[in-house]
From Swiss-Prot:
Domain ABC transporter, first and last residues per copy: 432-673
Entry annotated with the keyword Nucleotide-binding: yes
Gene3D superfamilies xrefs: ABC transporter type 1, transmembrane domain (1.20.1560.10), P-loop containing nucleotide triphosphate hydrolases (3.40.50.300)
Originating organism: Saccharomyces cerevisiae (strain ATCC 204508 / S288c)
Residue positions binding ATP: G467, P468, S469, G470, S471, G472, K473, S474
The protein's name: ATP-dependent permease MDL1, mitochondrial
Transit peptide, from-to: 1-100
Outcome after substituting S575N: Decreased release of long peptides from mitochondria
Keyword Transit peptide: yes
GO cellular component: mitochondrial inner membrane; mitochondrion
Amino acid sequence: MIVRMIRLCKGPKLLRSQFASASALYSTKSLFKPPMYQKAEINLIIPHRKHFLLRSIRLQSDIAQGKKSTKPTLKLSNANSKSSGFKDIKRLFVLSKPESKYIGLALLLILISSSVSMAVPSVIGKLLDLASESDGEDEEGSKSNKLYGFTKKQFFTALGAVFIIGAVANASRIIILKVTGERLVARLRTRTMKAALDQDATFLDTNRVGDLISRLSSDASIVAKSVTQNVSDGTRAIIQGFVGFGMMSFLSWKLTCVMMILAPPLGAMALIYGRKIRNLSRQLQTSVGGLTKVAEEQLNATRTIQAYGGEKNEVRRYAKEVRNVFHIGLKEAVTSGLFFGSTGLVGNTAMLSLLLVGTSMIQSGSMTVGELSSFMMYAVYTGSSLFGLSSFYSELMKGAGAAARVFELNDRKPLIRPTIGKDPVSLAQKPIVFKNVSFTYPTRPKHQIFKDLNITIKPGEHVCAVGPSGSGKSTIASLLLRYYDVNSGSIEFGDEDIRNFNLRKYRRLIGYVQQEPLLFNGTILDNILYCIPPEIAEQDDRIRRAIGKANCTKFLANFPDGLQTMVGARGAQLSGGQKQRIALARAFLLDPAVLILDEATSALDSQSEEIVAKNLQRRVERGFTTISIAHRLSTIKHSTRVIVLGKHGSVVETGSFRDLIAIPNSELNALLAEQQDEEGKGGVIDLDNSVAREV
């Protein structure tokens, strides 16, 4: 539901500025320039720091290359998908293009540090040979004081300087890649969040918040690591492998041939392992998403769980998800263990073979001790590079698996495009017409909500939609806000179909207050001014009037910090009535031409409800339209017209409250009588209101 609230105004834009400014993220003018955070252009508040809890993602549209799908699928591709990851790998490197010069600098530093490392075996071999030669010479004929044409002091001084250069290059490489990786993660997360906020309600309704959080956090980190740190390690392994192989060939081509006999088995094992680990990685990330989803649900519903004593059941449910993650992790551990154990055995066998052949060559005089020592060290470097390349490939496959999940969301085009269409100049003084509207929710296609529904709401009316649960009252609001498109028919403002409007700008002209307002973690003032245009937010008198219209003044006076009181996550530190009044204050401050109230006064006391009703009546006098969805008599009687919906979403009667209540057998009277009967049996049983909506 919070996604819908964001979309009513500048929410997606605000979120991107809060999450990370795109211009700063994509800029590479300075490597150490962190992603910037735009400040809200509102003088009265601290920049927003909202925690957006989104309904998660699993729906995949058939849309390809901008063509609209007629049958969107409801699930992302299977976690066990065996499709090639090379396309995803290519996209990984395309994604890192803005950081290419820093990655290139890091690779140059790798070349420097690797060159220093690869010089060590040659130096050690030379020292060993010189030491063995000096044993057979007298002091006068000794040449052991000369190393590569330098005296010992000069040589070791130069060697120390080279080692320092190598250390600085290695440290610089690590710093650059860490910073580059963080920038890449920030860019990827911002794009993914933008893609999530642009999705249609059908997509969001059928998917899990935990899965989305997993894509934003762990998946994005894995992807960034695979094209920064992992590429660095792979490059280092390649350099060591080529240099090591070259030096081995220079020292002894016979021993090199012995070493290379074992290379093909290592390559084959690495290829098989990489493919296996990619699929396991994707399964693991999907399972982690499911685990996060369960944890998010349980933490949000803690009070309900405790009220019904469901702690043990929920712990078992969470433990089941933990076991799923554990079993996949176990498979990954066993696969990795078998691979590295096998390659280790192959490597040790190779080293033993080299020692056997090498010692025989020393005995025959075709190789010195120093040369064999250097060869063995280069063999270790070359073997390590093979292991490094195997690890590089497996990590790259992990990145491909995570990238597939992230790109899957980024590539998904919403069925309802939020930025296409003409700008609606104004909705004031325009009738709202539901013309032959038929609708079923995409997630429940067999359950008909509306069939040939016809409603006309005149400008300046306060219309109240009533009816039994499931009659489609709240669906009217969802269709007006175009969370969903109708199956047939049209919804028009004046003579213009709302599908022709730029959706994002259209929603900014409508006020919307839900039964259970979802407040952001911040101050009360932050929430009242959420998405309010700066020119309105700067008017202190207008803010005070809006607070008074929603009857917030009294309870705000009881808070020591007043408007600067923190509301907590999802408004947890406020009562239901206080949250509704804050949401109403936001709506009154915006003062839209069309205001939709979905059970927006259900938690208010009678005094607050009367104050709100009087201010809604003033909207009618000014020619503004209000649409209320309600069950309570106190709300219904203040409307100028009542629309009674039947069980199958049809209009069974319409008229003023006084006219309908005066008809003894009217549907409105029947609904109220049923409510009174329920009160006589122990209280009003209102299914729409009795369920705690912990969404």
